[in-house]
Amino acid sequence: MNLPLKFNYNYSECMVMKLGLAIPDKEHKNKSKVLMTFDEALDYIKKINNITQGITKIYYLVGWQYLGHDDKYPDFFEVNKALKRKEDKTAYDSFKWLSDEAKKYHSVISVHINFNDAYDNAPSFDDFVKSGALIRKKNGKPNPIEKYNGRKCYKTCHKGYYESGLFKRQFDRFADTFPFIAESGTIHVDNFQCYKNYAPYVSIKEMQNARRKMIEYVKSKGIDITSEFTYKESNTLANKPIFGLPRDHFKSSPMDTVGLIPMSWWCYRMTDKELLETSPKIYCQGTFREKTLNNIFYGNMHGEDIVKKDNPDWINDFIYAFATYQVPGHYLNSLKRVAIKGRVNNKFCEFSDGVVSYAKGRKITKNGKIIKDGDTLFLPFVHEKSTYIAYSKNGDCRDWSVFEDDKTMADVYKITENGNEFVRKIPINNNKLHINLPEKIGYKIILK
């Protein structure tokens, strides 16, 4: 496939997640409800780095701006003051501090922003109205399609936004204000769907063309865009969800941003043909909305659903998700998808190297031998040579096949948030490794 853009990261082998920092406080006007400070974020980042064995991680911070998540879009120029560290003069300084410190832990700090939503409390809102950069009803009035944080949420008209020069002005200001984020080479743009405009009429296709120009402009600054969805809009797609149902894209419509957006948080409505022809290095998923595909291909765990101050067991939950979802996702992403067969729950995918992944039972085999059996696994850790991750949710004891003929011994390490702990050496006999796995403990195993 001839790619229009070259990405800064191979997202198919990174760990990409959000961290929720703050939301507007609905009970106290002009206040922010802090979920996690910059200081606390770094503490999580250190522990996650140990759990994930130092692989490259990209964190998109949610609620870093103004009063928190979804506040004052389409502006994104001020750091949330409630997140400031005591020892810093400004919240901006604290944000920059976190970005610098995270690099020590193989972690990239960036932001979760939005090019679609517009609220009337944004300083630039009047400019959007005057520039024709908002979706309008047939009567010419801006159309508040959704509602968040108790405020009407208007949508930007991508064509008007781009052609008016307003998009370039907004993004230039963002990149100039936060050079350390621009240097990260990646941002997450939430809900980047296209909507029809009715005054003047602008079709979905025209909006898609403008969206491509917006993505290309961001890339001209050296920055990749990841986003929320797989974008497969058609002109028959309604602007507003009907009867409260999700605004869903059609499976029959082509993927519009392949080669432009390398990763989506929610991947869905892809055909089997698209799944086979689109390499994860070009486009990969956080998770699939379709359970069957999620059980076959795995993906990038939504760590932000786990890493919360009100979750006292987040470490065990994180190790579980990393071992049973992230590790198999990275492993399968390293292989070529050859064929998808079966139907519904009996669906499976054949990969290169003799690997088959089954939806039923969430099993993975190599040359007919089990390497993942539901929540029990002994899988290659593709980031390090001759290294495996072993885990069992309910405990397990069995022989696992070793496919490397020259290995005679295995060093076993327990994975913890404070670093790996050496456990023991285990001999490899006749390409078999006998391991007793206590429940809910992750192990890193290095073959010698």
Which residues make up each language-model segment?
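Extended acidic/polar, glycine-enriched regions
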Residues: 1-8
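Aromatic- and glycine-enriched glycan-recognition loops and surfaces
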Residues: 23-129, 208-212
